[in-house]
Amino acid sequence: MKEKNNHSLDTFLVRKPGSLTTVQDRGRKFHQWLGMPVSGVLDHYAYRLGNMLLGQEEDAACLEITFFGPEIEILNNTEIVITGADVLPKLNGVHTPMWTLLSVQKGDILSFSVPKSGCRAYMCVNGGIAVNKIMGSRSTTLRLKIGGFEGRKLLAGDRIRKIGRASCRERV
């Protein structure tokens, strides 16, 4: 159940949404007979590797960033991994590496550029994005307006929560 006006558990604030940023996971498969289209990440390799680098289940929900990415304010300390298309991520205005564990702190600003190559990047989060599962998946299906964050792409002002989990360094 979502707590109203309790922002203490929020991890990210979307300051600028980018062209198409959605919550995705492995997706809903094998439900077509019920009229449910296939959903989920499009680059399974980048998505799975991001979650593996965080030492978590392969199916933890992430943000899928299409074309140009969002600007996100960090509201609570956590770890992330950015994979997929080379979106030239910046943390507080400084270029930051992809495909590696990044510790982000409260007040940090994360931004993404237009990809140098490819079109989809993934921001995997320690614990995964906390949204409800529908038919076994947290993926957004825009066509049906279900899953993910209220069944839609992220918008400016959206507050995103992650699933609570000890930091990667504490688990080592």
Can you say where each PLM-predicted feature lies in the sequence?
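Conserved "landmark" site that anchors the functional core of diverse proteins
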Residues: 1-169
